[in-house]
Amino acid sequence: MKPASLRADLLAGLTSSFALVPECIAFALVAQVNPLMGLYGAFIICTLTALFGGRPGMISGAAGSMAVVIVALVVQHGVQYLLATVLLGGLIMLAFGLLRLGKLIRMVPHPVMLGFVNGLAIIIALAQFEHFQHDGHWLQGKALYLMLGLVALTMLIVYLLPRLTRAVPPALVAILGIGALVYLLDLPTHTLGDMAQIAGGLPSLVLPDIPWNLDTLAIIAPYAILMALVGLLETLLTLNLTDEITATRGHPDRECVALGVANMTSGLFGGMGGCAMIGQTVINLGSGGRGR
């Protein structure tokens, strides 16, 4: 690897990690589980798919689409059933890859790709409005003006910095710069600590504490199948998008196998399920990331 490529990948990876952590915590809260489960899942899935997957430059982690799928299971049956579901869902993904079904993504029409990407962009944009609320009420007065000012300043950095220099990713400069500004001026803004209490150690290997019988299988199987289908679809469409952006071709079957193994590992170590994340992938590619 050339030094310039290594530098670009390191900076892009740092940028993506800053964006990935709060998102995975937020998705864990959506799924009504401990935020640590989101962090465990993000680390395990991102690491394994990066090392063994078939699409360099693509970012995977504990995704929001997976959180929405399994929230009802968590509410009704608890976290241990979620871990078993992640295990089974990973097994389905693994089988999908081993059967070489990933290449079917090449048959998806381009308009579907456009609809997928733009639909996710709208969802991501709409999701930002909740940050303009506090305790169910819209921000007003100084708090609102401060939020709007920081958002505008962040967008200006991302938009204008590439016109001055491309030595560093603009998203990384915006995150670090605005973070430092808020800290130095002691501005009254919300932090990750306000979203949830995050404390704990490293994950440990343990089987889900559930009765291993057909009744349990009947409970988790529908969620596992749905989780696998949603995860595979989002992953393969993101892989297709990455192919278009980089003008290279990935290996969808290999990515499916790696994603399945990653989800099974996450389930064994107490993490959430996950798949490719289009938002983080676009940030990574836009920051110059092309490698693993």
Predicted regions and their residues:
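Transmembrane helical cores of multi-pass ion-transport proteins
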Residues: 1-292
